[in-house]
């Protein structure tokens, strides 16, 4: 739902002069990136985990929300609102804030390492406010930022997750449950997902390059469809 509130097309056009192409894979710009519908080769590793994965993995090409770049997100925000309501986050009639059944408001903090990022996240904040979601922005110095990332002391951050052209053992540190609480690991999303764990181990055990590509694409799909981040 939050992804619908990030207007990449408007930001790219108005803040970056159209210089960026949005990522749609954890392994973007490589032969490891998934695309289109799931292939038969990938299904070999995904089908046994069908009960643990979102249905879209098997039926639909993954796509991030796309706007017309005008800044008018009414349609996307309507979709986001429907998803939030379905998940139990209703708009309170008095405060106009999103609250759950316990009366808790939907709010979080985004942690930044540089004031330069504020111009990127403030339009996002404004769109979230229209949904009844509160987002505060905190900018800290580099040393504090690194320490807070290492100890997972944040709600949301803006970051880049760089990947090798030959993924291997290091994938456990990014996505595996065993790294979710390991201070200093690169599992910043705190992923604890048995299906993802299994796909990571399968990737590491790939006997050749072709199998590595197939298994990485399968993992990529599982990560994308679980919406652990908002691609930018």
Task: Locate each region found by the language model.
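Append "and occasionally in soluble cytosolic enzymes with long acidic Gly/Pro-rich linkers
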Residues: 1-126, 218
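Residue-level signal for nonpolar/aromatic packing positions in well-ordered secondary structure
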Residues: 1-2, 84, 110, 128, ...
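Residue-level detector of anion-binding/catalytic polar loops
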Residues: 90, 134-136, 155
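Short helices/loops that flank or line small-molecule/ion binding pockets
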Residues: 122-131, 143-154
């Amino acid at each position: 739902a939050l992804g619908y509130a990030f207007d990449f097309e408007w930001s790219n056009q108005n803040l970056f002069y159209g210089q960026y192409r949005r990522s749609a894979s954890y392994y973007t710009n490589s032969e490891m990136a998934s695309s289109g519908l799931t292939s038969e080769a990938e299904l070999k590793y995904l089908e046994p985990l069908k009960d643990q994965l979102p249905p879209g993995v098997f039926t639909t090409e993954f796509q991030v929300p796309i706007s017309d770049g005008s800044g008018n997100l009414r349609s996307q925000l309507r979709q986001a609102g429907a998803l939030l309501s379905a998940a139990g986050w209703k708009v309170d009639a008095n405060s106009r804030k999103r609250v759950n059944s316990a009366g808790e408001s939907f709010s979080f903090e985004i942690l930044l390492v540089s004031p330069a990022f504020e111009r990127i996240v403030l339009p996002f904040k404004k769109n979230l406010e229209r949904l009844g979601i509160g987002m505060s922005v905190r900018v800290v110095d580099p040393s504090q930022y690194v320490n807070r990332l290492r100890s997972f002391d944040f709600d949301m951050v803006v970051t880049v997750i760089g990947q090798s052209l030959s993924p291997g053992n290091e994938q456990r540190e990014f996505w595996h449950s065993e790294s979710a609480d390991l201070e200093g690991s690169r599992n910043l999303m705190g992923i604890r997902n048995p299906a993802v764990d299994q796909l990571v181990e399968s990737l590491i055990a790939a006997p050749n390059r072709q199998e590595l590509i197939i298994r990485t694409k399968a993992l990529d799909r599982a990560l994308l469809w679980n919406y652990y981040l908002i691609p930018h």
